[in-house]
């Protein structure tokens, strides 16, 4: 029996094909030769497997966490694309050839599919396209741009996630104080409000879902302390320093969330 998917409980990620695969060659065809030649190119190369993109190792390691439960699907990844279904076929064939457990995709020719993030309860959207990321953020969704060149996927299973704090896990209200009142005013404000939690930011839901998976890992580790090694590690890396660090720690705890490590580097 297939594991059940509960969108309210699962960690659901939207990923653009530009983040998952290296599309530089086909994108160049689109830009330089136009849409019709691009469509022909994709048909001609339908069975040519796309090379992994920047987000590929991250997505693979997330999906691998589904082996922690036979009853429910812990992680679901959905491809969100401005391609039409025909040109998107190459993406889905490459997904299958790489052995990625991704079966859901939304292809909308030339249009942004972000409005489906909320009904699908997506905690994050990843893309290599800066404009797409900004558009998703402007619509109120958590989104991130993947940058650089893809690195070889070494097949490791460890998943290490680092979050900034202000404007990411938390809202940006403290950052606004810093901008308006300077460092001294900011430190004074954060010291006075050390026990008052900040409001949750755009990535807090993602951390909550990751924490749930970590809880399952903790149970596995307790049941098999010598045989199971935890894979997921979470850190906060922030420009905050003492005394402002206390409000960050207290906020995370009062939200009912946790991190393994914290780096206060202001």
Annotate each language-model stretch with its function:
Residues 128, 265-266:
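Glycine-rich beta-to-alpha transition loops that act as phosphate-gripper elements at the mouths
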Residues 2-111, 155, 165-264:
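Alpha-helical substrate-recognition element adjacent to the catalytic core
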Residues 20-23, 94-98, 113-152, 169, ...:
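Hydrophobic, ordered structural segments
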Residues 158:
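Phosphate-coordination loops involved in phosphoryl transfer and adenosine-cofactor binding
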